């Protein structure tokens, strides 16, 4: 009997970075860049980038929990972005780039809150973890040109300078979890 697939929705800066990293992991079957967390229905990239929609750039990950656990997805998440920066990552600033875990179940909420508490207790960073943990109310896929962006545009400036180093870091730190 095949185990049901599960879904995780995470925001940690530009969705191109997260998408590129998660697409390389065993057990991850699909990654969709999109928007979540705001009241605006069917937001556009332009509206989200204006910072007025309330949405964050996120990725929605469909994964096989028999191959990769939600906890492992969170481990990657907290390694490839800075969860101590409020409303921004690197050159990207605004609430649309906030660090946020949108949970789909009470179990995911417990795991996410536990991971934040663990990192806070361990004092992994000098600054406190500001990652929000919130229920997913709605997810809106981003425009087609945002999907699989890094693979289709590896030479683009932002991809070379911002995305590629995060992918390289994940490849180094999560070698055992990479697709062959």
Regions found by a protein language model. Name each.
Residues 1-180:
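Flexible coil/turn and secondary-structure edge motifs
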């Amino acid at each position: 009997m095949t185990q049901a697939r599960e879904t995780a929705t995470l925001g940690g800066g530009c969705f191109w970075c997260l998408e590129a990293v998660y697409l390389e992991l065993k057990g991850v079957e699909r990654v969709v860049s999109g928007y979540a967390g705001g009241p605006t229905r069917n937001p556009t990239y332009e509206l989200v980038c204006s910072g007025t929609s309330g949405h964050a750039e996120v990725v929605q990950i469909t994964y096989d929990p028999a191959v990769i656990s939600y906890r492992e997805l969170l481990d990657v998440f907290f390694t490839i972005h800075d969860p101590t920066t409020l409303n921004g990552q690197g050159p990207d600033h605004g609430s649309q780039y906030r660090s946020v875990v949108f949970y789909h179940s009470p179990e995911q909420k417990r795991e996410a809150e536990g991971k934040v508490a663990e990192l806070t207790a361990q004092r992994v960073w000098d600054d406190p973890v500001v990652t929000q943990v919130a229920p997913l109310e709605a997810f809106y896929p981003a425009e087609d040109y945002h999907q699989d962006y890094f693979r289709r545009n590896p030479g683009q400036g932002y991809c070379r300078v911002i995305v590629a180093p995060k992918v390289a870091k994940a490849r180094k730190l999560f070698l055992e979890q990479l697709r062959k």
